[in-house]
Amino acid sequence: MAGNRLVPRYAHTDGLTRLAYTRDGKFLLTVGSNQVIRKFQVGSDEEPDSIDNHQDPITGIAVAENYFCTCSEDATVCVYPIDSPTEHTLLARTTLPIRDVAYSVDGNWIAIASDETAVKVVSSTDSSQIFSLRPAKASNKHVTYSPNGNFLAVSSCNGILYFYDTQTRELIKFLTNTIASLEAESEICSKAAWHPKNGTFAVASTDHFVSVISPDDWLPLYKLLPKENHSGVTDISWSSNGMYIAASFKKGGILIWDTQSHEVVVELPYSTVVALAWQPFENVLSFTTNQGILYSCPDVIPKSILKEENDPTKPLTSSKSKNRTSKELDDLFGSDDEQSQNVNDLDGNSANEENEFINHDGLDSSLDLDGDSYMVDENDLNLAKKRKQKALIDRTTTIENGSSKRRLLQASIHKPVHTGSTPWQGNRRYLCLNLVGFIWTVQQDAEHNTITVEFHDETTHRKYHFVDDQKFEMACLDHEGALYASPATESSPGVIYYKAHVDWSRKSEWAMALPMENESPVTISLSSSVVLVCTSAGYVRVFSRQGFPISIHRSKHLPFVACSSFQDTIITIANDGLSSDGNSRLVYSIEDISRDEMLQTGDGVALPPQGTLESVFFSDVGDPYIYDSTGVLLVLMHWRIPGQAKWIPVLDTNELERRKSRQESYWPVTVADNQFHCILLKGASRYPYFPRPMFTEFDFRIPCNTNNPDASTSVPVLEELQLRNKLFLTLLEDSIGDGDVTEDEKISIARLEANIDKALLQLIQKACLEERIERVYELTKTLRRTTSIAAAQKIALHHSLTNVAEKIGNLLSNV
């Protein structure tokens, strides 16, 4: 049956999947990144039961006699009765995403591996019974119990395999140079897969073999050699009789070995497999892919070679392993001296501190993540404690001439806007969301939150987490690092904290307490050159990326609403009295930090009547944009020339064709490649939520006329097209200014001029057909290239419009 095509069952969406059979083999359970549990009845073609409980991708599943449990990136472990899985129980919660769970043999305990440094072990019936194992300052990827109940194996992300005695809870052995060092989210497997009967275990070794190791002497019994072009083990699973072992590979498919002959007996050419499970007591192998597809292969071992039971007389340790030289053993596991030293130094503790590996604190105990590296200096904190708490931003709204006037002015103050952030939804919120990635925070308790930083391009940077003792309320993210800010409190000052993504020495990490009494960050921004902080004290503070102060000035307009930055250019937006409709009037200022030059000062932000500001940002080429509450995107043109700047609408999302048939809105992200990048919000939703939202891009369409999208060459479409390209050309020419023009810029200018003239010539053609002489001549005068004017003359002559052709000829002679 292994050679026949298997029937796929689409269980989940793309992403990591896991599966497990119940111990009686009657049901097959799968989990995946779409937060859904599927319960398949073995041998039935009926639709599986679906259980939707977790908020984030499910990363692991384990099965006991009558129950099963799941874990998720939402940092929870839930337990379900197999017979009625909808009646789930939330058993445990950690501070960071959970990667794996495992039941003890008797089903009384559940081990939890997470991005925390501690492995938690919780009673499956009483969540108050819990203890922690702390092997090292690294997160953990897998946990597995030996079938005899003696050992708990922990696979750490640092490439060390730890073994604990389940009775004494003591660390009894750790193996180095055995498994690979991996990221927590990696599909590659580093778990210890236990033989169902004889006590040995298999691992994907660092040399790309599958090694079978005996805990009697912790030496490899034998190694299973994969076929050529097979690499990257994603899972390992033993058959229920222990006679066969299957391994899935990231490249190459699935291989099954006979554990006595050590030869490959079955090869299944299925790619992207990430999880394997043998059906108990049956010759059936099931597996899932990272595309969410489930396959089951009956009679996977051909009956002609099928072996029913392992030879009970076969010794656990081969003579070959007993005859290894001391050098070979040192190469495999390190010398005895190194082992002894590593045990002593495993968590930075001396030998007499090894009992600290066992921690009986609860799940929400503080983690030793070196989080104090960005804490504020003690002197600053002591100074802040002596200060009396005062009102921050709302202080500016106080008027002492009557409560009605106070209410009027308070209503007119535009609230601060931080581009890319969302309000709290439950216990989590996005601090920053842009084209680089996401930063979100999760409330844990009154003392701290946890922050996760994730990237769209995981090949550049990997996702990471840290414990947030400052309870940051704002963040900015770019390719090099992240900027955070927290407000002043009664006991501490406002804090600015910068953290580089890749900085093992932490020399690029810095923190700063704002010096003024009760001074809080109101809005912040991060560019490739500067850190910008606008505060409740009215100061615009500019720092270098290394925390060196560059400039400071007090704004003429308060309180601040928003800010943004691009290279050495910054824009700040603030309140400035009331507009004619009774709402707050917003003004902006633009400054070139490198030249210490104010380009625009106190000019108005072009908001519609009763409208508010939703977002402000620079595009990928450095032009300022705003997005207002009515769904209109505007760009600031001529902003480098003092007094000449004006806001040009480039897209009205209310006029999008898709908007006519859908109830949706658009949450702004940025502008890149002359496209509006946003997140679609369905129904009455105002903000994106979890799981991670997808981006959508819209081309600009200047609202200059009634556009008909069904006719790409209609007059309204062509009129808008030439106007849009003219805008792009103006923005490009403004950015060049009096500087030298590069070859790429020359090419871009020529392309835009050609696009403008092409649209105009099509309009001239239509005007000639309608014999609109004055319009033909008017359009011809706007052409930019001599060749285009000559083409317009030919079009006029083609339509026998000799008078206008003569006028066009006069234009040519004057060019």
Swiss-Prot record:
Q: Which GO terms describe its molecular function?
A: chromatin binding
Region spans: Disordered: 306-362
Question: Which residue stretches does the UniProt record annotate as biased composition, category Polar residues?
Answer: 340-352
Q: Does the keyword Transcription apply?
A: yes
Q: Tell me the compartments it is located in.
A: Nucleus; Chromosome
**WD-type repeats, residues:** 11-50, 53-90, 93-132, 135-174, 228-267, 517-553
Q: Does the keyword rRNA-binding apply?
A: no
Where this protein primarily resides, as one coarse class? nucleus
Q: Which GO BP terms, alphabetically?
A: DNA damage response; DNA repair; DNA replication-dependent chromatin assembly; DNA-templated DNA replication; mitotic cell cycle; Okazaki fragment processing involved in mitotic DNA replication
Swiss-Prot/TrEMBL keywords: Chromosome, DNA damage, DNA repair, DNA replication, Nucleus, Repeat, Transcription, Transcription regulation, WD repeat
Give the highest taxon in the source lineage: Eukaryota
Bridged cysteine pairs (disulfide): none
Recorded hits in InterPro entries, A to Z, give: WD40/YVTN_repeat-like_dom_sf (IPR015943), WD40_repeat_dom_sf (IPR036322), WD40_rpt (IPR001680), WDHD1/CFT4_beta-prop_2nd (IPR022100), WDHD1/CFT4_hel (IPR048591)
Q: Which GO terms describe its cellular component?
A: chromatin; heterochromatin; nuclear replication fork; nucleoplasm; nucleus
**Its job:** Has a role in regulating DNA replication complexes. Acts as a regulator of post DNA replication initiation. Associates with chromatin during G1 and S phases of mitosis. Required for the transcriptional repression of the outer repeats of the centromeric region. Acts as a polymerase alpha replication accessory factor and is important for S-phase DNA damage survival. Plays a role in lagging-strand synthesis and Ozaki fragment processing, in addition to DNA repair.
Record's subunit section: Interacts with pof3 and pol1.
Task: Please identify the protein, giving its name as recorded.
Answer: Minichromosome loss protein 1
Q: Which gene encodes it?
A: mcl1
